[in-house]
From Swiss-Prot:
Gene Ontology cellular component list: mitochondrial intermembrane space
Record's keyword terms, sorted: Acetylation, Electron transport, Heme, Iron, Metal-binding, Methylation, Mitochondrion, Respiratory chain, Transport
Cross-referenced Pfam families: Cytochrom_C
Residues carrying N-acetylglycine: G1
Extent of Basic and acidic residues compositional bias: 1-11
Compartments (UniProt record): Mitochondrion intermembrane space
InterPro entries: Cyt_c-like_dom, Cyt_c-like_dom_sf, Cyt_c_1A/1B
Official protein name in the record: Cytochrome c
Role, per record: Electron carrier protein. The oxidized form of the cytochrome c heme group can accept an electron from the heme group of the cytochrome c1 subunit of cytochrome reductase. Cytochrome c then transfers this electron to the cytochrome oxidase complex, the final protein carrier in the mitochondrial electron-transport chain.
Keyword 4Fe-4S recorded: no
Annotated organism of origin: Euglena gracilis
Signal peptide range: none
N6,N6,N6-trimethyllysine found at: K85
Length: 102
């Protein structure tokens, strides 16, 4: 994926609810370090039981499935977002999310 394009997509599609900064939660949890992390594990964020109990590790395949249709992949998630249908857009956003780490 194209991380630069993914950053722009993140800013237009995700940044209203998610921070890309370490330790900064918003309506949704911070997505800093999301790649490789287990769902429902950001300190200080009040997750839905569905997300806490899902125990999904956020990697290429799981992020694609979640971003395509969050409520189908994790029924009961608090994420009020219809999803991203275009595979290229998901690939680029995931490429950007991989850069959000120490």
């Amino acid at each position: 994926g194209d991380a630069e394009r993914g950053k722009k997509l993140f800013e237009s599609r995700a940044a209203q609810c998610h921070s890309a900064q370490k330790g900064v939660n918003s309506t949704g949890p911070s997505l800093w370090g999301v790649y490789g992390r287990t769902s429902g594990s950001v300190p200080g964020y009040a997750y839905s039981n569905a997300n806490k109990n899902a125990a999904i590790v956020w990697e290429e395949e799981t992020l694609h499935k979640f971003l395509e249709n969050p409520k189908k992949y994790v029924p009961g998630t608090k994420m009020a977002f219809a999803g991203i249908k275009a595979k290229k857009d998901r690939q680029d956003i995931i490429a950007y999310m991989k850069t959000l780490k120490d």
